[in-house]
C-alpha cells in the first residue's frame, strides 16, 4: 500500500506543477483489453522460480502468456503531454507434470502453477502531434506497483521420493519502471487505439514455502486495444 500511495503521489505532484489546471484540461478514461507475455527464459532474473522449475517440471515460460484487462484515467498537461493513473488485471494457471517421475500406478504427478498480477501505474505521455489531430501517436514512461500472488498446488515429490499433496503461496508488491508507446484515433468524444508496454519488476517469494527459486520475475510486454472516453 505504501508503494501504491507513492506512485499516486508522484502523479499528483506532476499534475500540481502543470501550467494548465487539470480541471480545465482535456480528461479521459481509457479501457484496455489485450495480452501479457512474460520475459523469455534467457532474459529472466537470477533465482526466478519459473526458470528453476523448468529443471524438473514440463512446461514453457511462454505458457504464462495470457489476457490482460485495464483502465486508466488520463489528464492533459497542455497540448503535448498526458499524465495517467491506471490499474490492470492479469491471471494465468499453467498445468504441469514432473519430467522424470510418475505415481506408483503410472499416472502423472500433476501440479498447477498460478500467477496473478494487479499492476497500478503512474505514467506521463508525450504526444508529438498534440491532442487536436486525426491521429495521436505517443510515447511515455512511468512507475508501476505490481501486486502479485504466485502459487504451486497439487502433487509433489519429497526428498525421500514419496509423493504428497500441498499448496505453496507467495505474495506481495514490487515496483519497477514502465515504458509505453501507442496511437489513438479520436472519434468525437470517443477514441480507439492500440498500445505496447514494457514492464520490469521482481517479486520476492517466502523462504518458508520451499519454492525452487527465491523470486518471481514480473517483467514482460503487454499489447492492448484501447477505447477512450473524453469528458
Q: Model-found features: residue ranges?
A:
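Transmembrane beta-strands of outer-membrane beta-barrel pores
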Residues: 33-39, 87-93, 128, 143-149, ...
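Repeated loop/turn-to-beta-strand initiation elements of outer-membrane beta-barrel proteins
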Residues: 80-83, 132, 188-192
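Cleavable N-terminal export/targeting peptides
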Residues: 1-26, 231
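Transmembrane beta-barrel domains of outer membrane proteins
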Residues: 72-75, 125-129, 182-186, 228-230
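Outer membrane beta-barrel transmembrane domains
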Residues: 195, 216-231
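Extracellular/periplasm-exposed beta-strand and loop segments of Gram-negative cell-envelope proteins
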Residues: 38-64, 89-120, 146-174, 201-222
Amino acid at each position: 500500500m505504501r508503494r501504491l500511495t507513492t506512485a499516486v503521489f508522484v502523479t499528483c505532484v506532476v499534475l500540481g506543477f502543470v501550467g494548465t489546471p487539470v480541471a480545465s484540461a482535456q480528461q479521459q478514461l481509457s479501457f484496455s483489453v489485450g495480452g501479457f507475455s512474460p520475459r523469455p527464459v534467457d532474459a529472466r532474473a537470477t533465482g526466478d522460480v519459473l526458470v528453476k522449475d523448468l529443471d524438473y517440471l514440463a512446461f514453457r515460460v511462454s505458457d504464462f502468456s495470457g489476457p490482460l484487462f485495464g483502465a486508466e484515467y488520463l489528464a492533459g498537461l497542455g497540448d503535448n503531454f498526458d499524465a495517467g493513473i491506471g490499474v490492470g488485471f492479469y491471471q494465468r494457471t499453467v498445468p504441469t507434470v514432473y519430467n522424470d517421475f510418475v505415481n506408483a500406478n503410472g499416472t502423472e504427478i500433476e501440479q498447477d502453477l498460478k500467477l496473478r498480477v494487479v499492476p497500478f501505474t503512474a505514467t506521463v505521455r508525450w504526444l508529438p502531434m498534440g491532442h487536436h489531430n486525426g491521429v495521436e501517436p505517443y510515447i511515455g514512461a512511468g512507475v508501476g506497483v505490481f501486486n502479485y500472488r504466485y502459487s504451486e498446488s497439487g502433487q509433489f515429490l519429497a526428498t525421500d521420493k514419496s509423493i504428497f499433496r500441498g499448496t505453496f503461496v507467495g505474495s506481495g508488491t514490487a515496483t519497477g519502471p514502465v515504458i509505453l508507446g501507442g496511437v489513438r484515433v479520436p472519434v468525437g468524444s470517443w477514441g480507439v487505439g492500440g498500445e505496447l508496454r514494457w514492464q520490469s519488476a521482481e517479486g520476492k517469494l517466502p523462504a518458508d514455502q520451499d519454492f525452487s527459486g527465491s523470486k518471481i520475475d514480473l517483467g514482460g510486454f503487454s499489447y492492448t486495444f484501447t477505447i477512450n472516453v473524453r469528458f
